[in-house]
Amino acid sequence: MKDNYILAFETSCDETSVAILKNGNELLCNIIASQINSHKRFGGVVPEIASRHHVEQITVCIEAALEEAEISADQLTAVAVTEGPGLNGALLVGIMAAKTFAWANHLPLIPVNHMAGHLMAASLVDTIEYPAMALLVSGGHSELVYVEKEGSYKKVGETRDDAAGEAYDKVGRVMGLTYPSGKVIDELAHKGADTYNFPRAMMNTHEVEFSFSGLKSAFINLVHNENQKGNDVIADDLENLAASFQAAVVDVLMAKTKLAMEKYPVKTLIIGGGVSANQGLRERLSAEITDEKLIIPPLRLCGDNAGMIAAAAYIEWKKGLENVQAGLDLNAKPSLVFEDIEEGEV
């Protein structure tokens, strides 16, 4: 049987990435050009800057991917690209590059949901046993997705307001940390203790939903109130603040993930998205998820990368190109979401 090679593009936010996947499980290359240093001084991603960097880096990444994989264009089976969600301008750079490459080399084009990519990164690590549940946590998303069978994604719960990663970055700014601050907060948290009584929103409800805006506000208010009293808690108690904040986030993520698995029993729990790199979350999951298979991708596959897009595209390819192939009129879908699960569907 002829080998399957998928060339994938990912430009949804601030990483320009091109990857080549062989037969759905062998990642031949995963080129990533990061823009973090360009966005640090702004305290977050600036869409216009992100788009310009993608334009500068995309051709370089394509050439590097083909060279590292030792693959020529005529060996490729298909081209895949993130169509959303993400920043509109950033998405368009990847889509235009993918459409151009596909057209020039007479290859089918497969559009991919960015969050399906985060979910299917797990398939590059281990075999997913279905049905599965996925906790996807990043700067823009916090959601639980039920995967009844390969290639079927239904959202069972999400955040009502801020995503977990967004809360980390906003709290990080208050703490005086540079963007992105999640890793530093995690490191500080491991040196401190949960000494502050930060709220755990919706912990005792039976809804599979998150809420982190109240936690963020409570953190900001505590720092402000202490400053009014002449206490600089940022300078004097940074590690305990970080530990208390992280404990509140992880407690909520764990509680709602367990609730989702009670409502929708599964064989595998998958963790994906940038916040899945958090060691505090990984430790809790490893300690408490014992009845289901747990798949947590390595750090290199947690952030945005084209390898995960290729993995999701391979699942789509197996459905038959007549069902998934996009035309050259493919456009960005910045607000693309998974369908909500219907009552009684499972």
From Swiss-Prot:
Binding site for substrate: 136-140, 169, 182, 186, 278
Keyword entries, A-Z: Acyltransferase, Cytoplasm, Iron, Metal-binding, Transferase, tRNA processing
BP GO annotations: tRNA threonylcarbamoyladenosine modification
Binding note for cofactor: Binds 1 Fe(2+) ion per subunit.
EC class: transferase
One Pfam family it belongs to: TsaD
GO (cellular component) term, any one: cytoplasm
GO molecular function: iron ion binding; N(6)-L-threonylcarbamoyladenine synthase activity
Record localization: Cytoplasm
EC code(s) of this entry: 2.3.1.234
Known cofactor(s): Fe(2+)
Binding site for Fe cation: 114, 118, 304
Catalysed conversion reaction: L-threonylcarbamoyladenylate + adenosine(37) in tRNA = N(6)-L-threonylcarbamoyladenosine(37) in tRNA + AMP + H(+)
Function summary: Required for the formation of a threonylcarbamoyl group on adenosine at position 37 (t(6)A37) in tRNAs that read codons beginning with adenine. Is involved in the transfer of the threonylcarbamoyl moiety of threonylcarbamoyl-AMP (TC-AMP) to the N6 group of A37, together with TsaE and TsaB. TsaD likely plays a direct catalytic role in this reaction.
Family per similarity comment: Belongs to the KAE1 / TsaD family.
Name this protein carries in UniProt: tRNA N6-adenosine threonylcarbamoyltransferase
